[in-house]
């Protein structure tokens, strides 16, 4: 079973969503199904079919979240040195073609927020820079083609969700 690294915030966020699905949304959709069923013929009952579809989506998400939480590896990135790129590292990189600098922080798969510069540790660019040190170059295949980057700095900054 492959572990999924995430922060405590990410774990708590997923656990809260799972609790809401089980405690609120699942019982509510059962009531919706019962109400729709009481309206008669199920073959042509759009309300019933919509509620059943909603139930299937909720059950699917419950299974997905349960699996993810079972595989979660909660990591405190402040507890270790960031001398190389790891989960929780804030990394400044430079595109060697354009000389454009970008800053990214590597977070769990459910914590990405590009507006804040938080990228999933499972993303191609994050995977390519894992384990690299300041001054190292790395290549990554992006939608626009292969690009080469240099790591300018690595440090730890507390996550601000």
UniProtKB/Swiss-Prot annotation:
Tell me the superkingdom of the source: Bacteria
Listed InterPro entries: GreA/GreB_C_sf, TF_GreA/GreB_CS, Tscrpt_elong_fac_GreA, Tscrpt_elong_fac_GreA/B, Tscrpt_elong_fac_GreA/B_C, Tscrpt_elong_fac_GreA/B_fam, Tscrpt_elong_fac_GreA/B_N, Tscrpt_elong_fac_GreA/B_N_sf
Key word Ubl conjugation present: no
Q: Does the keyword Transferase apply?
A: no
- Tell me which UniProt keywords the record has, alphabetically: DNA-binding, Transcription, Transcription regulation
Q: Name one Pfam family in it.
A: GreA_GreB
GO molecular function terms here? DNA binding; RNA polymerase binding
The biological process GO terms on file are: DNA-templated transcription elongation; regulation of DNA-templated transcription elongation
Family, similarity comment = Belongs to the GreA/GreB family.
Q: What does this protein do?
A: Necessary for efficient RNA polymerase transcription elongation past template-encoded arresting sites. The arresting sites in DNA have the property of trapping a certain fraction of elongating RNA polymerases that pass through, resulting in locked ternary complexes. Cleavage of the nascent transcript by cleavage factors such as GreA or GreB allows the resumption of elongation from the new 3'terminus. GreA releases sequences of 2 to 3 nucleotides.
Q: What PANTHER family does this protein's entry cite?
A: TRANSCRIPTION ELONGATION FACTOR GREA
Q: What is this protein called?
A: Transcription elongation factor GreA
């Amino acid at each position: 079973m492959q572990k999924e690294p995430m922060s405590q915030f990410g774990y708590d966020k997923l656990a809260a969503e799972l609790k809401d699905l089980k405690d609120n949304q699942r019982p509510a959709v059962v009531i919706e199904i019962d109400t729709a069923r009481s309206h008669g013929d199920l073959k042509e009952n759009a309300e019933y079919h919509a509620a059943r579809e909603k139930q299937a989506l909720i059950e699917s998400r419950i299974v997905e979240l349960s699996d993810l939480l079972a595989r979660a590896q909660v990591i405190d990135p402040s507890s270790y040195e960031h001398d190389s790129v790891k989960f929780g590292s804030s990394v400044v990189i430079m595109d060697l073609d354009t000389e454009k600098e970008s800053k990214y922080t590597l977070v769990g798969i459910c914590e990405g927020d590009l507006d804040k510069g938080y990228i999933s540790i499972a993303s191609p660019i994050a995977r390519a820079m894992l384990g690299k040190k300041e001054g190292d170059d790395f290549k990554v295949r992006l939608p626009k083609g292969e690009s080469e980057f240099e790591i300018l700095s690595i440090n730890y900054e507390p996550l601000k969700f």
